[in-house]
Amino acid sequence: MARRRDGKMCGKFTQMSSRQEVHAFSQPLVITKDADEVVVSTPMRTANIMRLSAAGEREMVPMRWGFAGHDDPNPSRPKHMHVRAETIDQRRTFAQAFATSRGILIVHTFNEGEELPNGKTKQWVVTPNDDLPIAIAVIFEEWHNGPETLLTFVMVTTPPNALIARITDRMPAILPREAWPAWLDETDASLAEAKALLQTYEDGGNWMMAPQQSSKPSPSPGAPKQKPQGELF
């Protein structure tokens, strides 16, 4: 198989957990009034991110995907979508957000793209067999332009595990449940300890990967309704 070597994440269609699902899965959690259901999220669009509030409570907050430059008057053209775990505390663009503004994006599935010899990209859907949501590490910051403000986030990436390495050289930084408190800054973890959480996630055979279907068949009458999907990677 041809593999991408640029270290950039690619792919389409991941399924966001609904607000109710995230609330049930992530207790204790406060749902803010602005955290509406998000079923589709693409770069430059919005997703709900879990973070720690000023009161020290977990909350879901809508944020736009992608960091724009601080001097860019238009945040709809972000310069960064992802950040490498290896250099997250070293690059000026990301170091402050890593130190003070860490969050979690919760999804059901995610896609990775395999670059083919003909220049096209083949999409693969990664799905956990146990059907439990996947927690992806993100960092966020507030973009300013005069009185206008906007919360934005980027996803953290790591080297791939054995499954993902078949098609690409990066994958999302997945956080096991026990890592959430330190990543969300609920504990006294140091920055070195927070960075140490960003390891390649070994799925232990729990994930399956299948080609993304190019089209969806029409559901038969009475068939269970499919959960909506959106683009994340």
Task: Label the model's feature ranges.
Residues 1-233:
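Short linear sequence motif anchored by a di-proline
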